[in-house]
Design a protein with these regions (language model features):
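Polar/charged low-complexity regulatory segments
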Residues: 1-137
Length: 137
């Protein structure tokens, strides 16, 4: 994850917060920034097998986080992707609950709201994240 991406998405998340009035605890907001920065230039983020099979074959916290993050990214950035948005939300929530920490239990509980917020960050912000990449870092 590049620092420049983190800086861009920190600004985007701040703008979305101001526009929507949605305020998350700081650790959730940081998680959204990190998630977007981590996925921005990845083209191989989808599971190798189906989402359902990936859920059934979670081996550890890392694979649970990867699947949860993928579902959160897909539902926020590509809300019309695939079968049904609620399918990916359900799988993402289930993956995050397998980690059983306060952070991931919170992300799981508020998954649809966080996903909608990510959608605003990427598609509905007055500040277009793509324009921010034109900055000379």
């Amino acid at each position: 994850m590049q620092d420049a991406y983190v800086a861009v998405f920190r600004d985007v998340v701040s703008t979305a917060r101001e526009q929507t009035g949605i305020e998350f605890p700081l650790h959730i907001e940081h998680y959204v920034v990190a998630l977007l920065a981590e996925h921005v230039d990845r083209s191989d983020f989808l599971p190798k097998s189906s989402f359902a099979e990936s859920l059934l074959t979670i081996k550890n916290s890392r694979t649970a986080k990867e699947l949860g993050d993928t579902c959160l990214f897909v539902t926020g950035v590509f809300p019309n992707y695939g079968i049904d948005r609620n399918y990916y939300i359900s799988i993402g929530q289930s993956a995050y609950t397998r980690i059983d920490t306060e952070l991931f239990n919170t992300v799981s509980a508020y998954f649809p709201t966080i996903s909608d917020f990510i959608n605003v960050c990427v598609h509905g912000c007055e500040t277009d994240p793509i324009q921010l990449y034109d900055y000379d870092w």
